[in-house]
């Protein structure tokens, strides 16, 4: 198991390192293209890549700590670091999109209030869109391949793959739409071409903001200590019940939490007979091995008690 964890961490590190430098290149390219083309959409794209670059650095450090054994200063290990990372990563992405909406809205307001709006330069946009979409597609495939090789358990790789898809969608959508704006000249929409990129930004934001919002809601539930998904809980409880039956113990219930790729399971049981500490340890080891196969990496605690550990309403 330790060898597998080391291999998975190596795969994750390699994928994140490639993503880090790719995003740094895309950040500079996006900001340079925004300056050359006077496009807010390109600026948003560049800022999004800059956030991805900074996040990749943090993700690599956090990924190396996940799964380490508890210490005196971190008695519960580092597993929740991954959840914290994904939570704040989602918040930052939401913040970038909100900032982009504000910039686009300001440009539209300036236009309709009679202010001056700079004319777009379309030349640099075409080259940028082709190069960046190709890079984002490659990154998304690289992250997803690493995600599968690590057993589909890394929330970091899953989040980065989604971020690469969003970045590619931003580049493709904004690039294609911006390049189509000159064709509106001479039509009823011709007078609005100067704010075309601002409108495109707002449409793209409405299309993709649901992804970081959904991720934020999921990780917030993990941080709040809400029970793991029903399917995961059912598998853990079934495994605990089976092992308890084999040992002749009475199974009360299992409490299951999820922290990124790690699961936390507490099993409440009543041996209904005198037991030694090493027998409880043997039960824990047998169940831990079974849970590892059923639901993935697990930290397990066993509570020997006559009750199920739940608060019951007073009669």
Where do the PLM segments sit?
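Alpha-helical transmembrane segments and adjacent TM-loop junctions that form the membrane-embedded core
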Residues: 2-5, 11-18, 41, 55-65, ...
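Generic low-polarity alpha-helical segments
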Residues: 30, 35, 298-300
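The first (N-terminal) embedded transmembrane alpha-helix
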Residues: 17-30, 101
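Short, hydrophobic transmembrane alpha-helix segments
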Residues: 32-45
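Active-site cores that bind ATP or allylic diphosphates and position pyrophosphate for catalysis
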Residues: 48
């Amino acid at each position: 198991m330790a060898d597998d964890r080391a291999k998975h961490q190596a795969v994750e590190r390699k994928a994140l390192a490639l993503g880090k430098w790719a995003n740094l290149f895309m950040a500079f390219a996006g900001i340079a293209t925004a300056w050359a083309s006077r496009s807010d959409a390109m600026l948003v794209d560049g800022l999004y890549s800059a956030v991805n670059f900074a996040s990749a650095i943090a993700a690599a450090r956090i990924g190396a700590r996940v799964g380490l054994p508890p210490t005196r200063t971190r008695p519960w290990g580092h597993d929740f670091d991954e959840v914290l990372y994904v939570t704040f990563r989602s918040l930052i992405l939401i913040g970038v999109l909100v900032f982009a909406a504000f910039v686009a809205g300001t440009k539209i307001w300036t236009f309709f209030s009679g202010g001056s709006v700079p004319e777009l330069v379309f030349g640099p946009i075409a080259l940028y869109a082709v190069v960046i979409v190709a890079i984002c597609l490659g990154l998304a495939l690289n992250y997803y391949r690493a995600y599968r090789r690590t057993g589909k358990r890394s929330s970091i790789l899953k989040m980065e793959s989604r971020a690469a898809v969003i970045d590619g969608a931003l580049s493709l959508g904004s690039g294609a739409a911006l390049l189509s704006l000159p064709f509106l000249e001479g039509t009823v929409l011709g007078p609005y071409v100067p704010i075309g990129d601002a409108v495109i930004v707002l449409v793209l934001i409405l299309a993709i903001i649901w992804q970081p919002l959904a991720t934020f809601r999921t990780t917030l539930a993990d941080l709040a200590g809400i029970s793991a998904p029903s399917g995961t809980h059912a598998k853990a409880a079934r495994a605990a019940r089976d092992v308890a039956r084999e040992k002749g113990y009475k199974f009360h219930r299992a409490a299951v939490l999820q922290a990124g790729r790690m699961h936390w399971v507490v099993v409440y049981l009543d041996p209904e007979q005198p037991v030694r500490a090493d027998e409880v340890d043997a039960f824990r080891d047998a169940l831990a091995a079974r849970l590892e196969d059923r639901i993935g990496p697990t930290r397990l605690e066993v509570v020997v008690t006559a009750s199920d550990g739940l608060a019951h309403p007073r009669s």
